[in-house]
Amino acid sequence: MNIMSHSFFKRIAALLLLSAVLLAALPGCTKRIDTTNEDKYYKTLTEVMDSLPASKHREFDAGMSMIWFYSESDDATNAMLNGKSGKEILAVIEEMKAALPKLDTSSKEAYESSLEKMKAGLPKSKVSTFNDWLKEMPAYRKGNPKIESLNGMTFQKIVENRDFVNSQNPAAQQK
C-alpha cells in the first residue's frame, strides 16, 4: 500500500506541477502590442483588437484614435503601448477619457475656463489646430445651438465633428 500511495502522490505532484506551468504560460498567450518596428506594431495592433470581444472593437478603435491624437510623438505612443494587452489599453483609454477636459457651455465663464483647460491639456503639436478652431467659433451666447451642441465634448471629439460644426458657421464656409 505504501508503494501505491507513493505512486499516487507522485502523479498528483506531477499534475500540480503541470497545472502550475500551464497557468504561468497563460499570460504569455495574451496578445500584446509590439512596437519594436512598424510591421510588428500594425500586425500586433490588429491581433490585440481581434483578441477583444467584438463589442469592444469600436471602443478600442476610437480609443486608439484618442491616444494618437493626444500623444506628443510616435515614440511616446510606442513607449506607452508596447507590451500592453487589449484589456490594459482599454483601461488606459478609460483613464484618459476621465482626465480630459470637456467643454462646459453652461455660462460664459464656464465656457472660457473650459477652453483654457482644453488648450493647456493639448500637446504642443495640436495647439495651432485648437487656435484655428477657436477662430471659427462664434462668440459665446447662451442658447446658441452651435455652442450648445459641443457641451461635454473633448477637443478631439470636436475636431472629429468639425465638418458638422463648420456646416453651421457661414464664416467658416467662406474660407
Show which residues each predicted segment covers.
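Sec-dependent bacterial lipoprotein signal peptides
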Residues: M1-P27
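Short hydrophobic "helix-edge" motifs at membrane interfaces and signal-peptide entry regions
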Residues: L17, K43-T44, S113-S114
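Bacterial signal peptide processing site
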Residues: T30-K31
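Post-signal peptide N-terminal segment of mature Sec-exported envelope proteins
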Residues: T35-E59
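Compact alpha-helical subdomains of small soluble proteins
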Residues: G63-K175
